[in-house]
A protein has these predicted regions:
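Catalytic-core segments of class I nucleotidyltransferases/pyrophosphorylases
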Residues: 101, 108, 114-121, 137, ...
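Conserved N-terminal catalytic core of the sugar/cofactor nucleotidyltransferase
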Residues: 2-5, 13, 27, 31-104, ...
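Conserved catalytic core of nucleotide-sugar-dependent glycosyltransferases
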Residues: 142-154
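A short, conserved acidic/glycine-rich loop-to-beta-strand motif
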Residues: 124-134
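Short, well-ordered beta-strand micro-motif
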Residues: 27, 133, 146, 174-176, ...
Length: 226
């Protein structure tokens, strides 16, 4: 299994904290966000870790070079932001031959990532991917799912005005090899939540965590947990 950490964002909603620091390197409890994810990946059998970069990329590259798993890491620098789906499909030749963890690195949570992988391995056969979800106290600010009795997503709406549930997308996924065969490589994808997820209703398994989960892309959330 490989992993793809999305770390290219500019963090505009986190100013002034991101004026001189890339979003993935801002600190939560005195540790850069990126390190939480790298340390979690160190606990499991990951073959290769891909990290996309853009904003203040040299700072991210310098930080990654110091990590003990640097020999497993491949940096994918984007001269122009490709978006969460664009980054994935621009590099599909690197990803398509193995299962892959896809993680938005500007999130923070303490959960056991191995439990997510085990859930994915026991998913119903029609499901191409597994989405980690949590109970959101503010569902209007999240991507909200409805699931059936088998924990399969039957609807997904990004930031709904009238949420039909409080089950929210963590933006942490396990993608199967079959997932990559579902789409044409030359399709013009940009955002994973808007361009990909809605096309996969009935094919997304879910794994719900009970731990707290935070989207650190918002300054209000960051001030709450930093």
């Amino acid at each position: 299994m490989n992993a793809f950490l999305l770390a290219a964002g500019k963090g505009l909603r986190l100013r002034p904290y991101t004026e001189n620091t890339p979003k993935c390197l801002i600190k939560v409890k005195n540790k850069p966000l990126l390190d939480y994810w790298l340390n979690e990946l160190d606990k499991i059998n990951i073959s290769k870790i891909f990290i996309n970069t853009h904003y203040k990329s040299e700072m991210v590259h310098s930080h990654i070079r110091k990590h003990k798993s640097f020999n497993k890491i491949k940096i994918l620098n984007e001269k122009k932001l490709l978006g969460t789906a664009g980054s994935l499909f621009q590099n599909i030749k690197l990803f398509k031959d193995d299962n892959m963890l896809m993680i938005h690195a500007d999130n923070y949570s303490k959960f056991n990532i191995l439990n997510l992988i085990n859930a994915h391995n026991s998913r119903p056969k029609q499901c191409l991917m597994t989405m980690m979800i949590f109970n959101s106290p503010n569902p209007k600010t999240c991507g909200i799912v409805e699931i059936d009795k088998n924990k399969i997503v039957k609807s997904f709406v990004e930031k709904p005005k009238k949420p039909l549930s409080n089950l929210a997308n963590c933006a942490v996924y396990v993608l199967s090899k079959k997932f990559f065969k579902e789409f044409k490589q030359n399709e013009n994808f940009y955002d994973f939540s808007h361009d990909i997820l809605p096309k996969l209703m009935g094919k997304i398994f879910t794994f719900k965590i009970n731990e707290s989960f935070f989207d650190v892309g918002h300054i209000k959330t960051y001030n709450l947990i930093k």
